[in-house]
Design a protein with these regions (language model features):
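Phosphate- and other anionic-substrate recognition elements at nucleic-acid/protein interfaces
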Residues: 1-153
């Protein structure tokens, strides 16, 4: 199982994804609960949307997000869980096939590839949450790399 994470300063979204892209579960929780989830489920691999510099000034929330990522990396190191970090432009470009991607374009690409988000459909659990969709998307990107022989499991 792959755990995709879209980190935030207070709450982080996660998506538990099987190797066949099946969405096993997702939520948006605080870092302490996310670390508890990692300890409980011990995923095969964790993929995190990384922070990327665009040469602009950033605020406190960006640094708080970096601290959250650091806490997650620390627990992964302690549990010997491999981690990959991917910036949003990298994974979004691959999934959507275009250079500049916003939340609605990413949502549409995921719906076209994996099915709808109405009740009973594959992506229903992600409906209404761009953060959970991003967590799923970063996991999908990593799985695409795995299936194309570009990364270790």
């Amino acid at each position: 199982m792959i755990l995709g994470i879209d980190p935030g300063p207070e709450l982080s979204a996660y998506a538990m994804v099987e190797l066949d892209y099946f969405l096993h579960g997702s939520d948006k929780i605080n870092t302490k609960l996310l670390i508890s989830l990692i300890n409980t489920h011990t995923p095969q691999h964790i993929v995190i949307e990384s922070i990327q510099s665009y040469g602009m000034m950033v605020g406190r929330s960006t640094f708080d997000t970096c601290y959250s990522i650091g806490r997650i990396l620390q627990v992964c190191d302690q549990l010997s869980i491999p981690v990959s970090l991917y910036p949003r432009p990298e994974y979004a470009r691959r999934i959507c096939g275009v250079g500049k991607v916003n939340d609605s374009v990413l949502r549409q690409a995921l719906l076209l590839r994996f099915g709808g988000d109405k009740k009973g459909e594959p992506l229903h659990e992600l409906k209404g949450s761009s953060d959970k969709r991003s967590a799923y998307a970063v996991a999908v990107y990593h799985l695409d790399l795995l299936h194309n022989g570009r990364r270790d499991k």
